[in-house]
């Protein structure tokens, strides 16, 4: 009986330790992962099988938690970095939509050219709102300043078109995380929603890193000084 109680107490202590590590942040999780990896590498031949199983399970759980933490940190960093650009791109897309809607009402609903432009603007607005939180935001309305990295620009343009195509498909199928109608009501992506996802494109990731200066140029192209003042009020 006493032996069983000691086992339960040890298991409880191990669970409590894991819980504390999980809540301690990315750096502590990384340190614990390294400790467990070293332990299993050096003493796997002499450790009891029950201990090995427990440590391997802990290691697997910690690696998963590390991935989740790093993903959350990436989402948080992207949200902070691209919030202003996305804010003004949404504003610009809404203005385009309202202008086109007014023209259609004035000229009639049979104007196919205006209808196509209206659809394109709807797609753009859905793009801004549903763009994945885990990726560097690719501006819809970038500046025309000549780039020193033409290949990077080409890959970025391709990635943008891929997302626009996916948005159009999801919009037509009514499977967007946030629909066009919901966007007009002010809805955004839920906190636990990442947004749209495409298959990884490593060539793009390697070639499309944008400096803060380039990000700033994109923002300056999207908005004017008066609008920037509105944002900070």
Swiss-Prot record:
Its main location: nucleus. GO terms for biological process: maturation of SSU-rRNA from tricistronic rRNA transcript (SSU-rRNA, 5.8S rRNA, LSU-rRNA); nuclear RNA surveillance; re-entry into mitotic cell cycle after pheromone arrest. InterPro entries: Efg1, EFG1_rRNA-proc. GO terms for cellular component: nucleolus; preribosome, small subunit precursor. Residues 26-109 form a coiled coil. Transmembrane segments: none annotated. Residues 194-233 are annotated as: Disordered. It holds the Pfam family Efg1. Keywords: Coiled coil, Nucleus, rRNA processing. It is found in: Nucleus, Nucleolus. It comes from the Eukaryota. Residues 223-233 have a biased composition (Acidic residues). Present with 2840 molecules/cell in log phase SD medium. Belongs to the EFG1 family. Involved in rRNA processing. Required growth at elevated temperatures, resistance to hydroxyurea and for cell cycle progression. This is rRNA-processing protein EFG1. It comes from Saccharomyces cerevisiae (strain ATCC 204508 / S288c) (Baker's yeast). The lineage of its organism: Eukaryota, Fungi, Dikarya, Ascomycota, Saccharomycotina. The gene is EFG1.
């Amino acid at each position: 009986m006493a032996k069983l109680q000691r086992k339960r107490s040890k298991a409880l202590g191990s669970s409590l330790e894991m819980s504390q590590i999980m809540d301690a942040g990315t750096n502590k999780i990384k340190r614990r992962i390294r400790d467990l990896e070293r332990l299993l590498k050096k003493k796997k031949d002499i450790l009891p099988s029950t201990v090995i199983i427990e440590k391997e399970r802990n290691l697997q759980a910690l690696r998963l938690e590390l991935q989740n933490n790093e993903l959350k940190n990436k989402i948080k960093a992207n949200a902070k970095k691209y919030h202003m650009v996305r804010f003004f791109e949404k504003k610009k897309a809404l203005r385009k939509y309202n202008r086109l809607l007014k023209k259609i009402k004035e000229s009639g609903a049979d104007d196919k050219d205006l209808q196509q432009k209206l659809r394109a603007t709807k797609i753009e607005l859905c793009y801004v709102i549903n763009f994945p939180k885990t990726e560097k935001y690719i501006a819809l309305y970038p500046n025309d300043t000549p780039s020193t990295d033409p290949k990077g620009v080409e890959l970025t343009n391709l990635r943008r078109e891929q997302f626009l195509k996916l948005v159009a498909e999801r919009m037509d199928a009514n499977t967007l995380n946030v629909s066009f109608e919901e966007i007009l009501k002010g809805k955004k992506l839920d906190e636990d929603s990442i947004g749209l996802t495409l298959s990884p494109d490593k060539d793009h990731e390697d070639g499309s890193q944008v400096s803060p200066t380039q990000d700033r140029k994109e923002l300056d192209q999207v908005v004017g000084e008066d609008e920037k003042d509105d944002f900070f009020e």
